[in-house]
Swiss-Prot record:
Alphabetically ordered keywords of this record: Capsid protein, T=1 icosahedral capsid protein, Virion
Organism of derivation: Torque teno virus (isolate Human/China/CT23F/2001)
Domain of life: Viruses
Free-text function comment from the UniProt entry: Self assemble to form an icosahedral capsid.
Disordered as annotated region, ranges: 44-64, 580-602, 638-662, 678-699
Primary localisation category: virion
Disulfide bonds: none
Location within or outside the cell: Virion
GO CC annotation, single: T=1 icosahedral viral capsid
Stretches with biased composition (Acidic residues): 681-692
Family: Belongs to the anelloviridae capsid protein family.
InterPro entries named among the record's database cross-references: TTvirus_Unk
Entry protein name: Capsid protein
């Protein structure tokens, strides 16, 4: 619409003459800049004014055909407009959990002394997630969706409330795919979000004292969503919006208030000392003594032969590894001399100290073994057979890793490293996750998982543990996997000059002193006998590196912070429900004692969108002459809602959590049988091409395969049945025009 159309406004009452009165714009109250006077043009009329014709104006020329058509859809019999108003804890973070994704840990029950939540959040909104928020009494529905199996999504209006002291950044996407990749969590870093093209900065009341206490913004439906009615059951799990946010510190972005330097320090195991990192019994035995558990061959290399031998010579330097404050009590029990490097470094005093320490170690190990058998009597196969991985005397014991050295110039099995986040360019950095059973420290494309590189460490560590857990699909990675790092921007550099692919194992002061990350000073016996570096012990280092980064909230200044987000989702429910009950005469109603009014607010009856489908409710066409048809009764009797009353416990992941990259569960099962058919066909062709002599040589193997063939066929049949059901359902939806864009799901 052109801007000058507003001048031709119709006045009431309608005038008799044809021309409308021209309304000129009012004079501005404020001073405005005037246009420069142009060249004088004569206003003499050069032509005769044409007289307008009465009636409808006629235009000459041939009418062209319309290029596009607007396809309309009939509305259902009943349409109800619903507003879903509620509040969401967008970010809840305790000190020590800055690196975590809050949505992933929102339903965690943390142990005593452990922080809760996370500083970043990455959520995906869908109708099922909104219903789960309703079950937690966090939102209110203005209209009920009961017996209405159709829906339309209109949009959502958000209201981001300003925190008194914490600023935060919000960004969202309406374009599919709504999935997380290896770069999704680290892209939530405040530095990268401020550099992104589209973002919303919600300033705190301390940063911006004036203004409204909230920031409002409206989000339209997804790009690939059609403006039509969908079945609620099919649309319940369809993502409609992906949002991510993080708290930031714009007032002191580069250096925390009250700190002297942005540099931090942590520890790294020396690859020359810890040549084996596996926790398997055979590997542990070989690394400890240089002898295989099933062999009599002995190697000259071994951890205890290098770090803590039973005897030394006058020229050896092995005593320096154990010259710590923890060995002082054993030295004084064995000798009456003062504890210094001259006395401890002599072969006689060192040997007597080792004998005292060895006796204490044997006695203590037997006590630990009995305690483990008492606590876990059924786990006899997992009873420790040696002390090599125990917390008190193992490879990673505080007797060897303690930072309380008498002198920093003595030999140590670790390296103290300093890191400056302002000097990290990112090029050459590399991190990955290895299973604790893996022996080597070098990166392997087949065995190593979740490799990221060429970004600063404070960005790579942001949400990395949550991404590894989501990518691997295991809930026990904190104890079964460890972090490997290569970084040339530390002092000294975490780069092996002989092997550029060899990584370093990082850990903090808590693990070096032999303490638990939580529940300190207590250590469970299951952790005590399996003490080695993993994500649970390395989380402290990741937290320190993340907290020192630019624009990051400093948990040293505040213990916790939380962000609240308000939302107003707009939906339309539709359907053809049964007619309401007949109207009765009020005077004929019986009387009874009036009950006391309740104290709780009355809420609407809201049905689960995932179960609200055309087969689970009655419609108007299900009645004939006031009675339900046999087909409708049979359909409803097949559906049982008894399972809804039994709670299966906490869900595996929150409903707002964004799923990882890849196909959905139903699509994955649908396409699995096609790959199974292709693999079986390829194997049959390869068997037909095999020569006769080769078949006779492998006759025994074929017999074993024949025995396993019925079990494999039954498994393939189950996969085929599940896949065909999904495919046929998609075909029927496509023919009826009820399909949803696969990129949205």
């Amino acid at each position: 619409m052109a801007w000058w159309w507003g001048r031709w406004r119709r006045r009431w009452p309608r005038r008799r003459w044809r021309r409308r009165r021209r309304v000129w714009p009012r004079r501005s109250r404020f001073a405005v800049r005037r246009r420069r006077r142009g060249r004088y043009v004569s206003k003499r009329r050069r032509f005769r004014r044409r007289r307008r014709r009465r009636g409808r104006p006629r235009y000459r020329g041939r009418r062209k055909k319309r290029q596009t058509l607007v396809i309309r859809q009939w509305q259902p019999d009943v349409v109800r407009f619903c507003k879903i108003n509620g509040w969401l804890p967008l970010i809840v973070c305790g000190s020590g959990s800055t690196q975590n994704n809050f949505i992933v840990h929102s339903e965690d029950i943390t142990p005593r002394g452990a922080p809760y939540g996370g500083n970043l959040t990455h959520i995906t909104w869908c109708l099922e997630a909104i219903y789960q928020e309703f079950l937690m009494h966090r939102n209110r529905w203005t209209r009920s969706n009961h017996d209405l199996d159709l829906m339309r999504y209109v949009g959502v209006r958000f209201k981001a409330y300003r925190h008194p002291t914490t600023d935060y950044i919000i960004s969202y996407s309406k374009t599919s795919p709504f999935q997380v990749t290896e770069l999704s969590y680290l892209s939530c870093h405040p530095l990268l979000m401020l550099l992104s093209k589209h973002h919303i900065v919600v300033k705190s009341l301390q940063t911006k004292p004036r203004g409204k206490p909230y920031v409002k913004f409206f989000c339209k439906p997804p790009k690939l969503m059609l403006n039509k009615w969908y079945f609620t059951k099919d649309f319940a799990k369809v993502p409609i919006l992906m949002m991510w946010a993080t708290a930031c510190e714009p007032r002191n972005p580069w250096l925390g208030e009250g700190t002297l330097s942005p540099c931090i320090g942590f520890y790294a195991l020396k690859p020359s000392i810890y040549t084996s990192l596996s926790n398997l019994p055979a590997k542990v035995q070989m690394f400890a003594t240089g002898t295989q558990s099933d062999s009599l061959t002995t190697s000259s290399t071994g951890f205890y032969k290098t770090v803590h031998p039973s005897s030394i010579t006058t020229t050896s330097k092995e005593w320096e590894y154990t010259y710590t404050g923890l060995m002082e009590k054993f030295f004084k029990q064995a000798t009456n001399k003062p504890y210094n490097w001259e006395n401890y470094g002599t072969p006689a005093d060192y040997g007597s100290t080792y004998t005292t320490f060895s006796t204490h170690r044997s006695t203590r190990y037997e006590t630990i073994k009995k305690e483990y058998q008492k606590v876990y009597p059924t786990l006899t196969t997992q009873t420790p057979t040696n002390f090599f991985l125990t917390q008190e005397f193992g490879f990673y014991s505080p007797y060897y890793l303690t930072p309380s050295k008498r002198d920093i110039d003595w030999h140590t099995p670790y390296t103290y490293t300093r890191y400056n986040p302002l000097a990290d360019k990112g090029l050459g950095n590399m991190i990955w996750a290895d299973w604790c059973s893996r022996d080597e420290a070098a990166y392997s494309p087949t065995q190593s998982k979740c490799m990221l590189k060429d970004l600063p460490l404070f960005i790579l560590f942001y949400g990395y543990i949550d991404w590894v857990q989501k990518s691997i699909g295991s809930q026990t990675i904190t104890r079964d996997m460890r972090l490997m790092v290569i970084c040339p921007y530390t002092e000294p550099q975490l780069v092996d000059p002989q092997d550029k692919t060899k990584g370093f194992v990082l850990y903090g002061d808590t693990f070096a002193n032999g303490n638990m990350p939580v529940l300190a000073p207590q250590i469970p016996i299951s952790w005590f006998v399996r003490w080695y570096p993993n994500f649970a012990h390395q989380r402290e280092v990741l937290e320190r590196v993340v907290s020192c980064g630019p624009f990051m909230v400093r948990d040293q200044e505040k213990n916790s912070w939380d962000i609240t987000l308000g939302y107003h989702f707009l939906f339309k429910w539709g359907g053809s429900p049964l007619p309401s009950q007949a109207i009765d005469d009020p005077s004929q109603k019986p009387t009874h004692a009036l009950p006391e009014p309740g104290t709780l607010p009355r809420i609407l009856q809201v049905s689960d969108p995932a179960r609200l489908g055309p087969k689970t409710i009655f419609h108007q066409w299900d009645q004939r002459r006031g009675l339900f048809t046999k087909r409708s009764i049979k359909r409803m009797s097949e559906y049982s809602s008894d399972d809804e009353n039994f709670s299966p416990g906490p869900s595996k992941r929150p409903a707002l959590d964004t799923r990882p990259e890849g196909l959905a569960g139903e699509q994955r099962s649908a396409y699995a049988f096609l790959r199974a058919l292709q693999d079986s066909q390829d194997s049959e062709e390869s068997q037909e091409e095999a020569p006769l002599l080769e078949e006779q040589a492998h006759q025994k193997e074929k017999e074993e395969l024949l025995l396993k063939q019925p079990q494999q066929q039954r498994q393939h049949q189950r996969v085929l049945k599940r896949g065909l059901r999904v495919l046929f359902g998609d075909v029927l939806k496509l023919r009826r025009g009820l399909h949803i864009d696969p990129l949205l799901t």
